[in-house]
Amino acid sequence: MTVHYTVEGGRATVRLDRPEVLNALDRPTLEALRDRFREASADHSVGVVVLTGTGERAFCTGADLDEQKAFLDRPNDYWDWMSHFIDAIEAVKGCSKPVVARLNGMAVGGGNELNLACDLAVAADDVVLRHVGPSRGSLPAGGATQWMSLLVGDRRAREVLLLNRPVAAQQALDWGWLNRVVPRAELDAAVDDYCEALLDKMPEITRATKVQLDYWKDLSWSMTIRMAREWLTVHAGSTEVAEGLASFEEKRPVDYRALRQSMGSNTRAAAEIEPSAGSQAALNGPPPDTNDAPVTQEIHDA
């Protein structure tokens, strides 16, 4: 089971349970996440939902890279994966109950987009948040390009999404990215505090307040997400994606300058970069599976 679901005392808890890959998102996990949030929405005994991950390393690190490698040879299959991701994000964002993100570890790429889909976010003080799309070959358009500027402002959103530097929890709190940051030992108590406060509210008015607050999020999402899915599908087998995946697997930096220069010519970028054997394999097809999944999962956008 990749997603655990419990209900107790009016609170539903949805927990991503793939710690071996830093709670990364594959299709079965996305389907389970969607279904559990729909279940919580329809359950009148539930007044608040907590979304979290197993372990202390990661809340969620976005797309499962083993699945993403397969799209190099079958880029049209990415459309189906992204559809599952969209459904999951919409189930979280559109939940009829307030959703509290309990950030037990790093939130990276699509993992941060799950965080952004929640209503409130509480993080342990050793957590980092990050997007790496332009660094590693993925467009961060599953919520980040749509919503980051609403939380932290346009300039800071550009800093996060273009520079791809890790942001410490306290800095994220100062920017308005998070609601509360506490020592790890106090994380559950802080989440409990929010949940108890939310349970002492009228359910219909709370739901309507969420809908009204989501106006700008819904507007930017509905105007961009379908085109983002098409763009990501068309480019799922591209040189940049292949090089990003290969550099992850081989634990080496991308030669961005050589990549940029080669893409300005009429030759395939891979020939100009002179990749290693492993990188060339990634460009020509899915690279071999890695036994070091946690490392490859640490930074990747949806």
Regions found by a protein language model. Name each.
Residues M1-T52, E90, A269-L283, T296-A302:
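Conserved CoA-thioester-binding segment of acyl-CoA-metabolizing enzymes
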